[in-house]
Design a protein with these regions (language model features):
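N-terminal Rossmann-like NAD(P)+-binding domain of SDR-like oxidoreductases, especially those catalyzing
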Residues: 1-181, 306, 311-314, 320-341
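A glycine/serine/threonine-rich, flexible loop-to-helix segment
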Residues: 48, 137, 188-196
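C-terminal substrate-binding subdomain of Rossmann-fold SDR/epimerase-dehydratase oxidoreductases
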Residues: 5, 18, 30, 59, ...
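The catalytic Tyr-centered alpha-helix of NAD(P)H-dependent dehydrogenases
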Residues: 147-154, 184, 188-192, 216-220
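Residues that form or flank phosphate/diphosphate-binding pockets in enzymes
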Residues: 13, 39-40, 65, 186, ...
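Residue-level recognition of oxygen-bearing side chains
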Residues: 66, 97, 104, 187-191, ...
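Proline-centered turn/helix-capping motifs that create local helix->coil transitions or kinks
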Residues: 122, 131-135, 170, 186, ...
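Hydrophobic alpha-helix immediately C-terminal to the catalytic Tyr-X-X-X-Lys motif of short-chain
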Residues: 157, 161, 165, 195, ...
Length: 341
């Protein structure tokens, strides 16, 4: 029985991926490694913790000794690396933490994986490394990396390290770059769960600038299936873009949330735009579609409706994660000199 290490597996995307692997691959064991920082939550794995094919280890990917011990403990043959600081707003407030976790942590993991003889390493990255697009076109795997934020810069640097380890040491590495995710268990600092939570509580919905920034949205279940497809069939040394084909302006998304919840658009509050805010992202996913036969299956309208229902059904989960640290960040970011427009 082969073992896959999923770093950041108690987070939003990671927990959805862990559940998929356990459901789809009965001969695979999953070891989840997660520090359980503010966005990591064991409750996200509540259906996995009792599975005999799943183990959980709490630890920091920057801790070389701990990472080496984990890789030496379970005959791990494959790694899907999701552990990261991932919120752009937080990276503006504290860039150093993003460099430490996203860059140094990736290097630590690569070094330990190489020494342990790990057969395959999948780096989970983001479309944000490509920077911003005009109104036309889309990012391909050959697009230059032009990150705009400390977050995207840290992910681009990590991607370069992954590629360098592949070229220098012959490691079997792959990189995925995905568009904006949404779905169950997403921490409420991100756009869709933030808007859902505020709308449910009749609080203002803060929208940056004119709200016409465009993002391509993909349901987390589609992203998870793409990651598994890359792990199993991707060509070593390659990059695979993953998009949902659902381009929407932020304002369109916010209005859809309000409409589905039966709330008035008067709750929308335009605030000062975020520094370095990219105007548009769009992904060309033809490579993964042609090579691996993957297709996004969830239509945005249905996925958003299902996501809202999940948050309504799991209001206790939402309240439990949106506690002290989150409230401190929310207050500092949305009240710290940012004004409604």
């Amino acid at each position: 029985m082969k073992t896959v290490l999923v770093t950041g597996g108690a987070g939003f995307i990671g927990s959805n991926l862990v559940r998929l692997i356990l459901a789809e691959e009965p001969d695979t064991r999953v070891l989840t490694y997660d520090l359980l920082t503010y966005a990591g939550n064991l409750d996200n794995l509540r259906n996995c913790l009792e599975d005999p094919r799943h183990d959980f280890v709490r630890g920091d990917i920057c801790d070389r000794e701990a990472v080496t011990a984990v890789l030496g403990s379970g005959n791990i043959s494959e790694i899907i690396h999701l552990a990261a600081e991932s919120h752009v707003d937080r990276s503006i407030l504290g860039p150093r933490g993003f460099a430490e976790t996203n860059v140094l942590g990736t290097v630590v993991l690569l070094e330990a994986a190489r020494e342990a003889g790990v057969e395959r390493f999948v780096q989970v990255s983001t479309d944000e490394v490509y920077g911003s697009l005009d109104s036309d076109g889309s990012f391909s795997e050959e697009s230059p990396l032009v990150p705009s934020s400390p977050y995207s810069a840290s992910k681009a640097a990590a991607d370069h390290f992954v590629e360098a380890f592949g070229r220098t040491f012959g490691m079997e590495v792959l990189i995925t770059r995905c568009s904006n995710n949404y779905g169950p268990c997403q921490f409420p600092e991100k756009l869709i769960p933030l808007m859902i939570r505020n709308a449910m509580n009749d609080k203002p919905l803060p929208v940056y600038g004119d709200g016409l920034q465009v993002r391509d949205w993909i349901h987390v279940s589609d992203h998870s299936s793409a990651l598994l497809a890359v792990l199993r069939g991707g060509r070593p040394g390659e990059v695979y873009n993953i998009g949902g084909g659902n381009e929407r302006t932020n304002l369109e998304v916010v209005r859809s949330v309000l409409r589905l919840l039966g709330k008035p658009e008067s709750l929308i509050s335009h605030i000062d735009d975020r520094p370095g805010h990219d105007r548009r992202y769009a992904m060309n996913s033809s490579k993964i579609q042609a090579e691996l036969g993957w297709q996004a299956g969830v239509k945005f309208e249905q996925g958003l409706e299902d996501t809202i229902q999940w948050y309504m059904d799991n209001a206790g989960w939402l309240d439990s994660v949106a506690t002290g640290e989150y409230r401190d960040f929310y207050s500092a970011w949305y009240s710290g000199g940012r004004t409604a427009g």
